[in-house]
């Protein structure tokens, strides 16, 4: 089994690439999905986040993701606080999913991890696949498709490693500055070369 580390900045198109790789037969371990699972009601991380950040619980006890994001990405210190609470739990759950992937019989496991490089998890994978798009295009996508305001989009991008560092860590780069169809053609070409 080959393990692919799929990464890229917010708004780069990782989800599109991950979906296509799943269609092609890869076993996907999605760190963002794991991150959502670990903050569901009743999970210890949710209580810790509520203690660390003011007003991040909805009246029904679920996480107010928008408010958490607003606070957590406001300063590097706040981002570090968020990461200290969530990342150890994400790592533990992803290890469970890696085991499931190995046992599934799939030939390719894709670790869809936005912070693969920042978190020093490159050594977990055999090949680093980076989805890349210029920052301004990513900002436009975040504003138009995810409903973020421009300043929030810029803050989130600034909280991640710079594009050059990400590209330098890549074994393969998929250029998502064009159409979705062009991106999917690149994914299919990558898959065919495995």
UniProtKB/Swiss-Prot annotation:
One of its GO terms (molecular function) is ATP binding. It is an enzyme of class 2 (transferase). It catalyses: 3'-dephospho-CoA + ATP = ADP + CoA + H(+). Keywords: ATP-binding, Coenzyme A biosynthesis, Cytoplasm, Kinase, Nucleotide-binding, Transferase. Pathway: Cofactor biosynthesis; coenzyme A biosynthesis; CoA from (R)-pantothenate: step 5/5. Its EC number is 2.7.1.24. CDD domains: DPCK (cd02022). PROSITE patterns: DPCK (PS51219). ATP binds at residues 11-16. InterPro entries: Depp_CoAkinase, P-loop_NTPase. It is found in: Cytoplasm. Residues 3-194 form the DPCK domain. Its main location: cytoplasm. GO terms for biological process: coenzyme A biosynthetic process. SUPFAM superfamilies: P-loop containing nucleoside triphosphate hydrolases. One of its GO terms (cellular component) is cytoplasm. It holds the Pfam family CoaE. PANTHER family: BIFUNCTIONAL COENZYME A SYNTHASE-RELATED (PTHR10695:SF46), DEPHOSPHO-COA KINASE-RELATED (PTHR10695). Belongs to the CoaE family. Catalyzes the phosphorylation of the 3'-hydroxyl group of dephosphocoenzyme A to form coenzyme A. This is Dephospho-CoA kinase. It comes from Corynebacterium jeikeium (strain K411). The lineage of its organism: Bacteria, Bacillati, Actinomycetota, Actinomycetes, Mycobacteriales.
């Amino acid at each position: 089994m080959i393990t692919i580390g799929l990464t890229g900045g917010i708004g780069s198109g990782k989800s599109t690439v991950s979906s296509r790789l799943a269609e092609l037969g890869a076993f996907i371990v999605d760190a963002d999905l794991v991150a959502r699972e670990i903050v569901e009601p009743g999970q210890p991380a949710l209580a810790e986040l509520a203690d660390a950040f003011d007003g991040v619980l909805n009246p029904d006890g679920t996480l107010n993701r928008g408010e958490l994001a607003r606070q957590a990405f406001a300063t590097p210190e706040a981002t570090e606080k968020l990461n200290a609470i969530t990342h150890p739990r994400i790592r533990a759950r992803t290890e469970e999913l890696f085991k499931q992937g190995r046992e599934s019989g799939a030939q390719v496991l894709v670790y869809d991890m936005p912070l693969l490089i920042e978190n020093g998890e490159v050594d977990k994978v055999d090949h680093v696949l980076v989805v890349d798009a210029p920052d301004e295009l990513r900002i436009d996508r975040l504003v138009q498709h995810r409903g973020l305001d421009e300043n929030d989009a810029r803050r989130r991008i600034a909280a991640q490693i710079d594009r050059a560092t990400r590209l330098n860590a890549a074994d393969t780069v998929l250029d998502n500055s064009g159409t979705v169809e062009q991106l999917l053609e690149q994914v299919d070409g990558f898959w065919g070369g495995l």
